From Swiss-Prot:
UniProt-recorded name of the protein: Ribonuclease pancreatic
Domain of life: Eukaryota
Active site annotation, chain numbering: H36, H143
Location within or outside the cell: Secreted
Function description: Endonuclease that catalyzes the cleavage of RNA on the 3' side of pyrimidine nucleotides. Acts on single-stranded and double-stranded RNA.
Cysteine-cysteine disulfides: C50-C108, C64-C119, C82-C134, C89-C96
Organism: Macaca mulatta (Rhesus macaque)
Amino acid sequence: MALDKSVILLPLLVLVLLVLGCLGRESRAKKFQRQHMDSGSSPSSNSTYCNQMMKRRSMTHGRCKPVNTFVHEPLVDVQNVCFQEKVTCKNGQTNCFKSKSSMHITDCRLTNGSRYPNCAYRTSPKERHIIVACEGSPHVPVHFDASVEDST
């Protein structure tokens, strides 16, 4: 009798654990927003911007993320890039898109010699076209691939 109950309960327990694991996981679109969107501010020449933002956005937990870009445009404008010029991603995938116009961004690069837990970043405000990888339905950005200067 006890064996019968465990045969029923074990698959149920596995199912519950799988569902709970999925509920707590950040979607790729939400991760993109957390790591790359800063719509409420303009590019900052404040030298501590990247140090503050990288920490605030959980990119210095357990390691120092070497490079990151923040986009200072409305989310809808960045989402619309998914319907603009299709380009090949750096990794060879074909789901990347380049913005028609330049966008205000801030590049954050780990400074030489900086080591976890003391992550220190160089802040570089720029105006560039962005390239993002998009997925899903509706098509939304899930990866920041690159930024490029105006080709004109």
